[in-house]
Amino acid sequence: MSQIISESLTALSSGQDLTTEQADAVFEELFSGEMTNAQAGALLMGLRTKGEKAVEVAAGVRAALREAKLIKGINSPCIDTCGTGGDGTNSFNCSTAVAIYLADMGYLVTKHGNRAVSSSCGSADVLEDLGVSLGTTVNEARDVLLRDKFVFMFAPNYHPAFGKIAPIRKELGIPTLFNLMGPLLNPARPTHQILGVGRPEILRLMAEVLVLTNVEKAYVIHGAGNFDELTPFGVNDAILVENGELTEVKIDPADYGFAAAKPEDVAVKDRPEALATIRKVLAGTAPQAMLDMVALNLGAAISILDGVSLEEGMEKAKAKVAKGVDKEY
């Protein structure tokens, strides 16, 4: 056992946070394959038991990205919309709809995702059904983005190192730091992000990690109803990340003219309904609660991309969602 692994596991066993140097070194060993499965399991369990801190999550992100297939040459602002998942809500795929609306409006969207976590369909499931390729390679991604304003990067294709860690995660059988890292590992390194969390206690943690991983501007959101998106069910909690500063924000749908709704208004019961619903959402013909939920998240994205107020972003979003996207799906 290397000295850094020994020091780190000893610290975690007594409930101590890892230093930046320890965290960087230990995750480098994890992703390089120098750590045994037993040591990796002890590391992940120790972090989970103690409670992960931003420095530790950020170190994991940096190490994972060093092993990832990164997209080069995107020299313009771009955005990802995603959540940690696991909120158990069985809602329609709002974040993917928001991404498609943004691209339809001319913003560059670098969508990074996987198959279903908490919904009936994950972003990959939905986009595959809409005809979007899941096989875009690292060499193709930039050109696809500049041509279509949208590129989807299917996570397993860009993070081969995770294949070595998957068996350990499966054996542990509990959420670990890797569940937090997922939304932070976009290989295109977007400048902007809408990041949803299903648990309010990790709202600030994820915002702090975005600062440490150099995202320029973002909203980290925890929606009313314990959703990992802004919802029209009540007041939503959010943190604006900008220039390394964190600002807590309450986003009340009523302030922007949205009618109150309930979680069941945005639920889908199975995969076929989820796939049919996304088409209605993109056409602007879905139930109003779903369209409002898309507009709320779209408005937040527009506000950080355009550098305008939430009110201006919401108005622009509502007008767009009312007519649907220009492309037919």
UniProtKB/Swiss-Prot annotation:
Binds 2 magnesium ions per monomer. Mg(2+) 1 binds at residues 95, 229. Anthranilate 1 binds at residues 83, 114. GO terms for biological process: L-tryptophan biosynthetic process. InterPro entries: Anthranilate_Pribosyl_Tfrase, Glycosyl_Trfase_fam3, Glycosyl_Trfase_fam3_N_dom, Glycosyl_Trfase_fam3_N_dom_sf, Nuc_phospho_transferase. Catalyzes the transfer of the phosphoribosyl group of 5-phosphorylribose-1-pyrophosphate (PRPP) to anthranilate to yield N-(5'-phosphoribosyl)-anthranilate (PRA). This is Anthranilate phosphoribosyltransferase. It comes from Maridesulfovibrio salexigens (strain ATCC 14822 / DSM 2638 / NCIMB 8403 / VKM B-1763). The lineage of its organism: Bacteria, Pseudomonadati, Thermodesulfobacteriota, Desulfovibrionia, Desulfovibrionales. The gene is trpD.
